[in-house]
């Protein structure tokens, strides 16, 4: 059975995890973003957030079609998060820019399945895709 959380608790958890990711070096400045499923919508970190300026009131509720209200804009990567929620049963998405992953991506090729844990990514390898401008549909 899936445990249900209220909106305030989800916002607080997203904020705490965003700060944690930065504190352990998985994100720097405003790179990376986190979200969670919230009913038929998602809650996502705001555009321009950093570990030092994010708070639970800044987390943005967004429909999976990209509609939101309020003064804050969602992360520019909301489309990627929405696509994952539309296609899977995922309950949360964590997108980081860790130094090691960036270094691997700069090689321009996927990560081969050299260890059984690669299978946790859903295949026999971790694929690579060419760079595209962040926040676009591409």
Q: What would you call each of these model-derived segments?
A:
Residues 1-138:
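Glycine-rich flexible loops
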């Amino acid at each position: 059975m899936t445990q249900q959380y209220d909106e305030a608790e989800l916002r607080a958890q997203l904020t705490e995890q965003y700060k944690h990711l930065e504190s352990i070096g998985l994100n720097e400045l405003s790179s990376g973003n986190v979200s969670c499923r919230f009913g038929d919508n998602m809650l996502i970190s705001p555009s321009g957030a950093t570990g030092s300026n994010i708070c639970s009131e800044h987390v943005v509720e967004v429909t999976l079609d990209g509609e939101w209200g309020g003064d804050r804009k969602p992360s520019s990567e909301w489309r990627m998060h929405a696509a994952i929620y539309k296609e899977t049963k995922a309950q949360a998405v964590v997108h980081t820019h860790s130094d090691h992953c960036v270094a691997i991506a700069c090689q321009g090729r996927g990560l081969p399945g050299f260890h059984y844990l690669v299978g946790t990514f859903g295949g026999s390898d971790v694929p690579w895709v060419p760079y595209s401008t962040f926040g676009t549909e591409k």
